[in-house]
């Protein structure tokens, strides 16, 4: 199990098939679930840029509309225990980064599952 004190490192930025539009699908999901403006999100193949943009959105939501942030986490089905673990951590400065990593990881898993379902492999 990955410690929440370390940043998730994506060996392949789009582990489920970059050639199949994972970056575009990720941006679309983030836009829908977190009201990110598509035009302001970095290029779809720039995971570091997308992550940085998402970190800023997490900071904004947590400080201005915490209930909406929690609602968004619930809507994308992020594990409540993982959210609690991040919020209880001693290192408060990395909370937005850890949430961004968790959101990206969950969104990529959702995309993979949807694609498997559509192709009849699930």
Residue ranges of model-derived segments:
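Charged, compositionally biased N-terminal leader segments and the immediate start
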Residues: 1-46
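Conserved, well-folded catalytic cores of nucleic-acid-processing
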Residues: 33-37, 57, 61, 76, ...
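Intrinsically disordered or highly flexible coil/loop and linker segments, enriched in small
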Residues: 36-40, 67, 109-116
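Amphipathic alpha-helical interaction modules
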Residues: 38-76
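Amphipathic protein-protein interaction modules
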Residues: 62-101
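Amphipathic alpha-helical binding modules
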Residues: 87-122
């Amino acid at each position: 199990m990955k410690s929440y004190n370390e940043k998730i490192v994506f060996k392949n930025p789009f582990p489920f098939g970059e050639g199949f539009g994972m970056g575009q699908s990720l941006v679309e999901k983030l836009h829908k679930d977190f009201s990110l403006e598509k035009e302001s999100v970095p290029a779809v193949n720039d995971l570091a840029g997308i992550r940085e943009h998402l970190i800023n959105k997490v900071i904004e939501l947590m400080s201005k509309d915490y209930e909406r942030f929690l609602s968004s986490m619930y809507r994308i089905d992020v594990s409540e225990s993982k959210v609690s673990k991040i919020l209880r951590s001693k290192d408060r400065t990395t909370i937005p980064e850890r949430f961004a990593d968790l959101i990206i990881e969950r969104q990529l898993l959702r995309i993979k599952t949807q694609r498997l379902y559509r192709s009849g492999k699930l």
